[in-house]
Amino acid sequence: SVNDPETMAADAINAIQRGYDCLKIKVGVNPKLDIDRLAAVRKAVGDDVCIRIDANTAWEPKEAVRILNGMQEKGLQIELVEQPVKAHDLEGLKYVTENSYVPVLADESVFSPEDAVKIMQMRAADLVNIKLMKCGGLYNALKIVAAAGVYGVEGMVG
């Protein structure tokens, strides 16, 4: 959930105590507050816990790069950012991938094996998220996995 920094830090500690070693945090509405939340969570859980962020298509490409690089400069150690720009803005996605220190995961941009291949050919993302429901089932998911192997792009099922 998206709460104030203190609540999010407490929630993060709770998740770690329950055995989680990687956290996914929604971002995208208020960059300053996002950074404050992430800083509180990072301070609470330490450096050994992975933090991933999901912008849910909230940013414009240049804004995404500025925000993500700012997060890295503050030492927040973000493992990856999920879908920082609009789903169909593959050039924007590529811009973020090429100019950010944070690895980019394409999610909402991947609806089919053809979408995934286009993203991989363009090098528009570092990783692709494969969702069975969204891509049309197991057969299409396996096509995406095969393409990821060919293009050297990491796939994630989620």
Specify the residue positions occupied by each region the protein language model found:
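Catalytic domains of carbohydrate-active enzymes, especially glycoside hydrolases
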Residues: 14-26
